[in-house]
Regions:
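Active-site-adjacent loops and short helices of periplasmic peptidoglycan-processing enzymes
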Residues: 1-85, 89-94
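Domain-terminus/edge residues, biased toward the C-terminal soluble/receptor-binding domains
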Residues: 62, 75-78, 82-274
């Protein structure tokens, strides 16, 4: 089976455990393993590309369009560094068991030792992923992630002339981030932070809060000037179901919006009978 680019050396007609295909994709960047996985999941690589683009749309990757599963050059196949960072973040948060593969330095398949191309795994113990890449049109690329003292950062470098430049730039970005940024829990989830008047309800008010903790990674100096602006819907009437969105909270620093989160009802309020 001839396949352009990196390969895991899969033999045609031979059954391969799914975990070996995943390791071949993650560690070796094996295009043969990638296509095999795509065909197993969706029947054809083209069908899997449709799945990829659907997920990209769901994640808000507005500057991404896939044409193949391997990342090989195609004039209509593109993404951005921001979208890659978002994709990496979702991978880490939503598939933690799968993400453990990304820090493995090597594996052996078909009696061939295959080594992870991410040199940062050897240079920095806090680095646990994510993925290298190279094509003649994109240059040398690396999405890297590291975690120190409970704070995780993701770095994306693309278009480097050499692989060493990619690793050097990625390490510098991570060091800069850990030195000058901080991750802080600003508000607790499922905890009352505001109340709102309720019309025609068995209770005349409803507690409001966040669905989950509000955690932000920002420059250290920014934390000193954080303020909250609560925007609660007007004329809230019963019935109200628990979890109903009834407003938003804006997080600002020196008047600049950092993020917004929905304010939800923490309890239900039934309609008052007559």
């Amino acid at each position: 089976w001839k396949m352009e680019g990196s390969r895991t050396f899969i033999e045609v007609g031979k059954k391969v455990p799914l975990i070996d295909l995943l390791r071949g994709l993650v560690i070796q960047s094996g295009n043969d393993a990638t296509v095999a996985l795509a065909e197993y999941i969706a029947g054809t690589e083209e069908g899997f590309v449709d799945v990829m683009n659907a997920y990209a749309s769901e994640m808000g990757l507005s500057n991404t369009l896939f044409q193949n599963s391997t990342g090989l050059p195609n004039p209509s196949h593109f993404t951005s560094t921001r979208d890659l960072a978002v994709l990496g973040s979702r991978l880490i948060s939503e598939f933690p068991d799968h993400y453990k593969l990304y820090k493995e330095r090597e594996f052996t398949f078909n009696e061939i030792r295959q080594v992870n191309r991410n040199k940062l795994l050897w240079q920095d113990d806090s680095v646990d992923g994510i993925k290298t890449g190279f094509t003649s049109s994109a240059g040398y690329c690396l999405i890297s992630s590291a975690q120190r003292n409970g704070m995780r950062l993701i770095s994306v470098v693309a278009g480097s002339a050499t692989s060493q430049n990619t690793f050097t730039s990625s390490q510098r970005l991570l060091e800069y981030g850990f030195r000058f940024f901080s991750t802080k829990k600003l508000l607790n989830g499922n905890e009352m932070i505001q109340t709102s008047k309720v019309w025609a309800g068995k209770s005349d008010s409803v507690p409001l809060g966040l669905e989950s903790d509000l955690i932000l990674t920002v420059p250290r100096a920014t934390l000193k000037t954080v303020t909250f602006n609560y925007k609660i819907n007007s004329n809230i009437e019963a019935p109200i179901s628990k979890g109903m969105k009834l407003g938003v909270v804006d997080v600002l620093s020196d008047g600049k919006l950092l993020t917004s989160k929905p304010l939800i009802a923490l309890d239900k309020v039934e309609e008052k009978g007559f």
